[in-house]
From Swiss-Prot:
Modified residues annotated as Phosphothreonine in this record: T98
Cellular compartments per GO CC: extracellular space
GO BP annotations, alphabetical order: lactation; protein stabilization
Upper taxonomic lineage: Eukaryota, Metazoa, Chordata, Craniata, Vertebrata
Name of the molecule in the record: Kappa-casein
Amino acid sequence: VALINNQFLPYPYYAKPGAVRSPAQILQWQVLPNTVPAKSCQAQPTTLARHPHPRLSFMAIPPKKNQDKTDIPTINTIATVESTITPTTEAIVDTVATPEASSEVIESAPETKTDQVTSTVV
């Protein structure tokens, strides 16, 4: 078993050779001879041809996951909720505008009165 380390793989793969075809049937790169060089082909290097669908002779199998993980104990997160009476204080604001008896328009701020009200929330 060969270990394949590649910078583009997130984790290493183990390669197991597989008998897909016999070695005589596996197509490899072949060099085509340039027997009759034409004037346009003389400057070109020797060309390579290969089968359009290459067959792989091995399979990449990811490693087994770590079996040494410890089990996380289950915790009962459902708890009974007891209702408690919590007093809340709310402010009630009464706004009263006092009209003036004279005919002149007097701009004054309205009087405000604040009462404390205590209520219980169940």
